UniProtKB/Swiss-Prot annotation:
Family: Belongs to the SEC23/SEC24 family. SEC24 subfamily.
Protein name according to UniProt: Protein transport protein SEC24
Topology with respect to the bilayer: Peripheral membrane protein
Ranges where the record places region Disordered: 1-50, 67-107
Disulphides: none
Chain positions covered by the region annotation Zinc finger-like: 224-249
Low complexity bias locations: 8-50, 89-98
GO molecular function, one term: SNARE binding
InterPro entries the UniProt entry points to: ADF-H/Gelsolin-like_dom_sf, Gelsolin-like_dom_sf, Sec23/24_helical_dom, Sec23/24_helical_dom_sf, Sec23/24_trunk_dom, Sec23_24_beta_S, SEC23_SEC24_subfamily, vWFA_dom_sf
């Protein structure tokens, strides 16, 4: 290919004038006050002054707002929508008492000590101001809001022990609430129709070394004697700093002497430098009192399908090769990791390792009704000590089952055997299957999909657990500290709905690969990469999660993959690093304090044998005003909560009930807002008004009703069950993209897109500015999920969190096709699951940039998912007849276009029609 940089015809790449840009549209906002307060109403007519970004920013600058989510300075946290407040109300602002030289000498004058247990000055503190958006005038919706942080948390300036601490309140990536101002009583919460819940994500990366969480290793842990809360940045020091008052229950506790004096070195210490008093997210190295037993080694038992379907599809050989190549990635710093291997068809094939010898013995157990371990030792072995023998087994493993004709798969007995093998230690049972379990305990059969798919009883007949074994066995595993992970690969029915119970109650995950085949290089790449990443994850072991809140607040419901051992204790045999959890709360008594507190603690053993406690702290102000509640609602966290509730209804009731629940929730919220917060509740005013910080919520919940998991169209039950499972476990950034896919326009992207982002650095000595390239690839701005934002000659990339679609419009410019694919003939371009040809920057700048963008999107430090790329050629009046008759291409087009959730389909409305239908449901 010749070296060139093609200049594409500008008229063809100009933005369509009729399509508004997807920028924040704030011109319809007006500052809103509670109903009954004097306010000058502004109309929406042509004569009304536009209320733009500058005006909104000015309003935020004029507000005496403090606090916010910690982790970085306020100016960096809330760029775009929320501006930094004046420093006098900022709890993160540096504080120095008059005449004080250190924290140790200033505590006597600190307001916290003057009024123990009270939050001074909070009554006069203004909270986030309410702005109203007319949803019907906000079309297309401003999707840039989906990347904004939640509304800032406004706290009194003296609410923390160490005023100079910049991250005393938990970052939303770890710990966030649906409401960043809590109702002071339950009646106000019910009146708002907004959910009160916490979203907890203790780990944000797959590997410990990519985190920057402070660790206190002296094993000195100070906890409240009454409620057992951990000392944190929001406690109050009393009695000249010798005691601390719990911010949860108000009990006074002694401060450990080790906070002020190091017995080992004989030197004085400054308690105000303690990690737990300065940081919202900390990790304690736990003493022996926190251990029921010595931390156990990490254990992986691989249960591998060796039936005819698995062997013929290449699953058996691919998995053993992947495990072999991933042995160095298994967390094993302390050289204690153990592994075992079981092959499964109608028999159980154990592999015994002989100590001191190179070979292994294959031991076959045909009694699957009462499976037993054929040897007391040699089945579960140390990875480091037996490395060469393990490698040889993995190389030879597929040869043991070549030419098999056995079509049986005894998954239940294999799970029982694996459980017996590791139940005294705990660990993981990782199952790789290509066959429906069809023999022995847990045997499953085909369901009548044709009769029930898309019908009212679909949930009951196709999505329910078909055998109680999968729930009861999962509970047994949880008690024995055993997690089950599933990797399901088959072109046939596998009953994902039943099998997914195993990971759901053992803190595992179900990975689904429909129609997987080793004949497709892309299939092999995806499975291998995801398995390898999964094995490399620095999981925590023998973990429990407890979330506590201030007096008057109760944790009522828990959502996610774990087992709820008691009313407030969630059990995790192993704690994954790529999932999040939702906890619903109830207000049981009136809250009289101006700030409430939440604390999530994960007691766990690290994969390198250390017992630790990860503690996350969150402080949120309270209010008795409904407008404060709405102005500080976190729309992404609210959407996360409604997602969990809709999944629960899909399983327990029906899919129509789940969709109706989502629509009713939006209607209820709009009704409350119109009745209580629209100024004067003027008759004839638009019923579709909502606070600006919630304006994406109707779009997200509408998109959820059209999602593969909930849509009313016929969907294969395995696909639907797998989608429901993802909805209930994905962290918020991935969940939002899974509900509302991200679309990028590639044909008219800026010259800087696809290249490293340029950063201006200032030399501290000379003051000179220097432009350097960062490691971050710049992505194009996203478009709305609608064909109306597309051009019929464009090139678009769709990211739905699990796959990537490269849409090549049927009337695309031939030069662009050549630069991207190396051919002028559009219809010679390979479609479906594929990869782009690789050209250097000199050969084709456009190809290089697009591949860089795809590579950047695939980079995920917090997920094991590898996104396959599907190339889709769009329709055209000029396409050959044989192309338009290709069923696979037609299906691929429909799949990709289903990501454009704002558009109308044959059976479902578009977002504009949805908003119109809401008007009739809103009380006039």
């Amino acid at each position: 290919m010749s070296s060139r940089r093609r200049a594409y015809p500008q008229p063809q790449y100009a933005a369509t004038p009729a399509v508004p840009a997807a920028d924040p549209q704030l011109q319809q906002f007006q500052p809103q006050q509670a109903q009954g307060q004097a306010q000058q109403a502004q109309g929406y007519g042509a004569g009304s002054p536009a209320y733009g970004v500058d005006q909104v920013n000015q309003q935020f600058q004029n507000m005496n707002v403090g606090g916010g989510v910690a982790g970085q300075p306020m100016a960096n946290q809330y760029s775009g929508q929320y501006q930094p407040p004046p420093s006098q109300a900022n709890p993160q602002a540096p504080y120095q008492a008059p005449g004080a030289d250190s924290f140790g000498s200033q505590f006597a004058q600190h307001p916290q000590y003057a009024q123990p247990g009270m939050v001074g000055g909070a009554a006069a503190l203004p909270l986030n101001q309410l702005y109203t958006t007319d949803l019907s005038r906000e079309l297309p919706p401003s999707i840039t809001d989906l990347s904004l942080p939640p509304p800032p948390i406004v706290l009194p300036a003296n609410s923390v022990v160490v005023p100079t601490s910049e991250d005393s309140n938990a970052p939303p990536e770890y710990f966030r609430s649906t409401l960043n101002v809590l109702p002071a009583n339950n009646s106000l919460l019910k009146k708002s129709k907004l959910p009160l819940a916490l979203v907890v994500r203790p780990y944000n990366t797959l590997h410990i070394d990519s985190e920057n969480i402070p660790v206190t290793s002296d094993t000195i842990i100070s906890r409240c004697r009454r409620c057992r809360g951990y000392i944190n940045p929001f406690v109050t020091l009393t009695e000249q700093g010798r005691r601390w008052r719990c911010n949860f229950c108000n009990l006074q506790n002694d401060i450990p002497s080790a906070f002020d004096y190091d017995e080992l070195t004989g030197t004085a210490k400054n308690k105000f430098e303690r990690v737990e008093l300065n940081h919202s997210v900390v990790e304690f190295v736990a003493p022996k009192e926190y251990m029921a037993r010595t931390p156990q080694p990490i254990v992986y038992t691989f249960i591998i399908d060796v039936s005819i379907d698995a062997v013929n599809s290449g699953l058996t050989s691919t998995i053993t090769r992947t495990i072999l190549e991933s042995l160095d990635r298994i967390p094993n710093d302390n050289k204690t990791a153990r592994v075992a291997f079981i092959g499964v068809d109608s028999n159980l094939h154990y592999f015994k390792f002989n100590e001191g010898l190179d070979g292994t013995d294959l031991l076959i157990v045909s009694d699957i009704d009462e499976p037993f371990l054929p040897s007391p030792d040699g089945l579960l072995i140390n990875l480091n000590e037996n490395r060469s023998t393990i490698e040889k087994l993995l190389i030879d493993f597929p040869t043991y089952f070549e030419g098999t004709a056995n079509d049986r798969f005894a998954l239940g007995p294999a799970l029982r055997a694996g459980h017996k093998m590791i139940s005294n230690i705990g660990g993981k049972l990782i199952c790789f299957t290509a066959t429906l379990p069809n023999i022995g305990e847990g045997k499953l059969t085909l369901r009548d999909e044709a009769s029930h798919s898309g019908k009212p009883k679909e949930s009951q007949m196709l999505l329910s657990n078909a055998d109680k074994f999968y729930k009861s066995f999962a509970v047994e595993c949880n008690s024995a500290q055993v997690t089950v992970d599933l990797f399901l690969t088959s072109a046939k029915y596998q009953d994902v709905a039943s099998l997914a119970n195993l990971p759901r109650f053992t803190a595992g995950q179900t990975h689904f690969y429909p129609a997987w085949s080793c004949a497709k290089a892309e299939d092999v790449t995806k499975l291998s990469r995801e398995v390898s990443e999964h094995l490399s994850m620095d999981i925590a072991l023998e973990a429990v999660l407890r979330v506590r809140g201030s007096t008057g607040i109760r944790m009522s419901s828990f959502y996610g993959n774990f087992f709820n051992r008691s009313s407030d204790l969630c059990s995790f045999p192993t704690f994954p690093r790529d999932q999040s959890y939702c906890i619903e709360m109830s207000i049981e008594e009136t809250i009289h304090k101006s700030v409430v507190y939440f604390q999530a603690a994960v007691l766990h053993s690290t994969c390198f044998g250390e017992r630790r406690i990860r503690v996350m702290n969150l402080a949120i102000p309270t209010s008795t005003k409904l407008d404060d509640i709405f102005a500080s609602a976190d729309q992404l966290a609210v959407a996360n909560y409604f997602t969990h509730r809709s999944v629960e209804k899909a399983f327990s009731s029906s899919l129509p009930d789940a969709r109706d629940y989502l629509v009713k929730s939006i209607v209820d919220i709009l009704n409350v807002y119109k009745k209580e917060l629209v100024a004067g509740n003027v008759s004839g005013s638009s019923p579709l008004q909502l606070s600006t910080n919630l304006r994406m919520l109707p779009l997200l919940l509408f998109s959820l009703t059209k999602h593969l998991a909930l849509r009313q169209e016929r969907v294969p039950s395995d696909h639907r069950a797998a989608a429901l499972n993802l909805l209930s476990s994905l962290p918020i950034p991935h969940l939002i993209k899974y509900i509302y896919p991200t679309v990028y326009s590639l044909h008219n992207m800026g010259d800087e897109c696809g290249l490293p982002e340029q950063i201006v650095q200032v030399d501290e000595e000379t003051g000179e500015e220097e432009t350097v390239n960062s490691t971050e690839i710049l992505l194009p701005e996203p478009l709305n999920d609608t064909k109306a934002s597309w051009e019929n000659y464009g090139l678009y990339l769709i990211d739905n969190s699990t796959e990537l679609f490269l849409w090549v419009s049927g009337d695309v410019v031939p030069g662009l096709v050549y630069d991207l694919f190396g051919t002028d003939n559009l219809y010679s371009v390979p479609t479906g699951k594929t990869e782009l040809p690789e050209f250097s920057f000199e050969e084709s700048e456009f190809n290089y940039k697009v591949r860089q963008i795809i590579g950047k999107i695939r980079e995920q430090k917090d997920s094991v998912t590898w996104k396959n790329l599907y190339v889709v050629i769009g329709g055209s009046s000029n396409e050959p007849i044989e192309i338009s008759q290709q069923r696979d291409l037609m299906a691929l087009r429909m799949w990709a276009l289903s990501c454009l959730v704002e558009d109308k389909t044959a059976s479902e409305p578009g977002y504009r029609e949805f908003l119109t239908s809401l008007k009739s449901k809103i009380t006039q």
